[in-house]
Amino acid sequence: METSAPRAGSQVVATTERHSAACRADPLRVSSRDKLTEMAASTQGNFDGNFESLDLAEFAKKQPWWRKLFGQESGPSAEKYSVATQLFIGGVTGWCTGFIFQNVGKLAATAVGGGFFLLQLANHTGYIKVDWQRVEKDMKKAKEQLKIRKSNQMPTEVRSKAEEVVSFVKKNVLVTGGFFGGFLLGMAS
């Protein structure tokens, strides 16, 4: 006696076909889930013995590390990790950034200061002659150009980047707070 119940997996194929059709509209966004659904759909009615089983453990091992960490669609980290994990990740990355920033800043300040010192020494000993009238003339010209370009509106590129940063901070408040706290600790150490 035959029943009219759908075959096992037919509902999954129907929902995944809708998802893969939506994702196929964007050619840059091709995920491994889409590949799996296409493979499943193409072999759905073909059980003549020519099919290959898929070992999900092996498939997961072949995925890049960033896919495992961020998932298919990396959204706000607040949805993925606990509060403590977010603060820890933000704090550690902030501390590392602050520590590196402090050490590189010292090196850069030493290099710039040493360069100015050598230029002053060369000027004092007569190796370099500075035409101060020409410097003053160029400074006046630069001031005039700045006055001409001065406006109260930000360029659209700057505005769009600022909006992106604000959106990121709003979505990831804990990670951002941990980062800034860690950055300050890294600068102090």
From Swiss-Prot:
Segments on the Mitochondrial intermembrane face: 102-107, 186-189
Primary site of residence: mitochondrion
Sites of Phosphoserine modification: 10, 53, 151
Transmembrane portions of the chain: 81-101, 108-128, 165-185
One GO biological process term: autophagy of mitochondrion
Keyword Transcription among record annotations: yes
Membrane topology type: Multi-pass membrane protein
Protein name in the entry: FUN14 domain-containing protein 2
Gene this protein is translated from: FUNDC2
